[in-house]
Amino acid sequence: MDRNFIIIDNFLDDPDSVRRDALSLDFDLIQESVPGARTSATLVGDHQTEVETKIKTILGGEIVWDWTQASFKFQSCQEGTETWIHKDSPEEDQGEWAGVLFLTPNPNHDAGTACYLTKEHCYQYFLAHGMDPETSFEEFNHGSVIDMGAGNVYNRLVLYRGKVLEHSSIVPGFGKTLETSRLTQTFFFDVK
């Protein structure tokens, strides 16, 4: 059985305290390669232990965090934030798994996350559905066909393979302030 996209609802025991702690941090990391703003600081300690223990139980192995990426950092995407389809772990030496934890109560459900078919898979998809691959790539934003997706639900963790094409789903961000924005925490890791 392949496990490539996993959704866990009610992930944290106390998401409100994690959210409160996250909102007290500075969202001071702006990068061209990352939508919105991230914290340069992380929350670890007891929070890291809880996350690690639960992911270990779900995936059945030791968790090795990829600290070269934004593990345990928080990200805010407000209304109007531009996003794009990308791979969270494009390099060979980066973590095999990625995770997004949604931390906004009563969010826009369409601001979840989605994984997309590669160009090669899109070609096969178009053929299988009786569409012309040559014209369908333009119609589907250069071949952007969602393979798997999950809506934004408070305290939902979505785990997926970091080497697949990923994008915040239909709505990239929402809210006009940090408190009302699409607040997430990201994780990057391997399982041994």
PLM regions and their residue ranges:
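Catalytic core of non-heme Fe(II) oxygenases with the double-stranded beta-helix
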Residues: E79-K192
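Non-heme Fe(II)/2-oxoglutarate
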Residues: M1-I85, G112
